[in-house]
Swiss-Prot record:
It holds the Pfam family MMR_HSR1. Residues 1-159 form the Obg domain. Keywords: Cytoplasm, GTP-binding, Hydrolase, Magnesium, Metal-binding, Nucleotide-binding. GO terms for biological process: ribosome biogenesis. One of its GO terms (cellular component) is cytoplasm. Monomer. This is GTPase Obg. It is an enzyme of class 3 (hydrolase). Mg(2+) binds at residues 173, 193. The keyword Oxidoreductase does not apply. Disulfide bonds: none annotated. Its main location: cytoplasm.
Length: 389
């Protein structure tokens, strides 16, 4: 199935049902009080994370989704039926962004997690709601409010602990094949990898972490060169980045210049992503003699002014890959728990929050909801006439 990691859809929640104006009319009760019921709330639109999905391709073909409208209220204090909610299934790792405001509504990072993206319209009020000591026969009602409409950008961000970063043909796909059972395509030409790949690494029995391989970056990717930077978003949730460098590029380019170009593209895309822990990994060490290898590594590190972790490996022969995987796992385990370190989600405001409270306060500050329909009688308000001879 084609990998689609971004889609734009329009969602509309259901409108609320309108209230009803009605009066109780039964045998022996000709002048009953108001009994108009409220309308039903409109259905809302939710996103739910589904483990069986791994692409947003379904939302490329159908882009408009409408929840059910609430029914109108009826007499005898019958409340209208609420509209059914609409649930849209998306892959785990999906982020919902409001296109009009650029507000992030939420991230679905766990199976079964549910996110409200469009709130249904509130029900209208029946005339029963407006009775009071001074208004015994109200003929007021309110209409249901409109359901929210949002244009959403759905972004699928892969959930991985380790992200691979580097130029095309640096050996990223070969490395992920060496340490996991993932089988991305490997060939001796640039941009062999066209979509992100995930692999589960088991460095020791009972231990595992997830690694993500994305298409290679080149200088000018932020301006659209190569495959651009659209796949960098898949590294946003990674806890550590492996910057893989080809120590002996076949085109004779400078590894140090390649490393600087990658860092520059990272900073253009997201300073937060560029600030993540990053390890420098020299690949294809089997192409050099041991003495020459160390000299080359020291020279590149000095040219870059690099002060972080430095590792060497040969992904093709798997030399050094197992040790690197074990160190990665130990480093990930030493990091604080993400749930504890994460900032609490911002409150998302929806259109009709607290709508009726203000409406009732304005229209009827002395609202009394006691059930006194049987005591209502127009005769209470007649003028008493006394006949005299």
């Amino acid at each position: 199935m084609k990998f689609v990691d971004e889609a734009v859809i329009k969602v509309q929640a259901g409108d609320g049902g309108s209230g009803c104006v009605s009066f109780r009319r039964e045998k022996y009760i000709p002048d009953g009080g108001p009994d108009g019921g409220d309308g039903g709330d409109g259905g809302s639109v939710y996103l739910v994370a589904d483990a069986s999905l791994n692409t947003l391709i379904d939302y490329r073909f159908e882009r408009f989704y409408l929840a059910e409208r609430g029914e109108n209220g009826r007499g005898r204090d019958c409340t209208g039926k609420g509209g059914s909610d609409l649930t849209l299934r998306v892959p785990v790792g999906t982020r919902a962004v409001d296109i009009d405001t650029d507000e992030v509504l939420g991230d679905l990072t766990e199976v079964g997690q549910k996110l409200l993206v469009a709130k249904g319209g509130f029900h209208g009020l029946g005339n029963t709601r407006f009775k009071s000591s001074v208004n015994r026969a109200p003929r007021q009602k309110t209409l249901g409010t409109k359901g929210e409409v949002r244009e959403l950008r759905l972004e699928l961000l892969l959930l991985a602990d380790v992200g691979l970063l580097g130029m095309p043909n640096a050996g990223k796909s070969t490395f992920i094949r060496a340490v996991s059972r993932a089988t991305p395509k490997v060939a001796d030409y640039p941009f062999t990898t066209l979509v992100p790949n995930l692999g589960v690494v088991n460095p020791r029995p009972g231990q595992s972490f997830v690694i993500a391989d994305i298409p290679g970056l080149i200088e000018g990717a932020a301006e659209g060169a190569g495959l651009g930077i659209r796949f960098l978003k898949h590294l946003e949730r990674c806890r550590v980045l492996l910057h893989i460098l080809d120590i002996e590029p076949i085109d004779g380019s400078s590894p140090a210049e390649s490393a600087r170009a990658i860092v520059a593209e990272l900073e253009k895309y997201s300073p937060e992503l560029a600030a993540k822990p990053r390890w420098l990994v020299f690949n294809k060490t089997d192409l050099l003699l041991e003495e020459e290898l160390q000299e080359r590594v020291d020279a590149i590190v000095a040219e870059l002014g690099w002060e972080g972790d430095v590792y060497t490996m040969s992904a093709a022969t798997r030399e050094g890959t197992k040790e690197l995987a074990e160190k990665l796992f130990d480093f990930i385990k030493s990091l604080p728990d993400e749930a504890a370190a994460a900032d609490p989600d911002k409150e998302v405001e929806f259109k009709w929050d607290n709508y009726h409270k203000a409406q009732l306060d304005d229209l009827n500050p002395d609202f009394d909801d006691s059930d006194d329909d049987d005591d209502f009688d127009d005769d209470d308000y007649d003028v008493e006439v006394i006949y005299q001879r």
